[in-house]
Design a protein with these regions (language model features):
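Amphipathic alpha-helical interface elements
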Residues: 1-86, 101-112, 119-126, 158-179
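Amphipathic, Lys/Arg-enriched alpha-helical patches that create a basic surface
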Residues: 131-179
Length: 179
């Protein structure tokens, strides 16, 4: 068995199918984390629109002091946005016009998968060349990482990005109308 972050058992590691499964898992891990990062950066812009407006200096300070990943994670940013939008009637109207319950579920799913890929155990079984992600979500769970599943996660993440970017565009336009 080969664990992505550390060597456990070399038996079968030289088999081409194991190596391919390992490379596929690394590639999908990187892409899921990358697309989640893009969503997080877009959320940063939406939160800046809401809290500090368009002035560059304020935005940069807000991002570096409040929205930095050391202070505020992706899930916390989502909760802040959800709470903030509900407190401002015209933004709430815009958000509800854009709101799609399925996309919100996909955002939560993206956050969960991003955290699992980033922090939990990705294992390639040397005997079967099957890659699994072992993670904790209330209890220990595992999911087989196939190309189909990984591409589905990535496609959902891209839809979430487009949705958040749409919120950013709508909020940015609404801010310009107020100025």
């Amino acid at each position: 068995m080969w664990r992505i972050n550390r060597f456990v058992d070399g038996n079968g590691l030289d088999q081409e199918s194991v190596r391919q499964s390992y490379e596929m898992a690394k590639s999908f891990r990187a892409e899921v984390i990358d697309v989640a990062t893009l969503v997080e950066l877009e959320l940063d812009d939406v939160l800046c629109d809401f809290f500090v407006g368009s002035e560059f200096g304020f935005r940069e300070r807000f991002k570096s002091h409040i929205l930095s990943t050391e202070v505020c994670g992706l899930f916390q940013k989502w909760k802040i946005l959800r709470s903030a939008v509900n407190t401002k009637s015209e933004w709430s109207t815009l958000a509800k016009a854009q709101k799609d319950t399925a996309l919100i579920k996909e955002l939560k799913s993206l956050i969960s998968f991003r955290n699992s890929f980033a922090h939990d155990e990705l294992v390639v079984d040397a005997k079967s060349a099957v890659c699994t992600l072992s993670y904790f979500e209330g209890e220990r769970k595992t999911i087989k990482i196939t190309k189909k599943i990984a591409l589905s996660i990535i496609d959902e993440a891209k839809l979430v990005f487009q949705w958040v970017a749409g919120l950013h565009y709508a909020f940015e336009g609404e801010m310009e109308q107020r100025n």
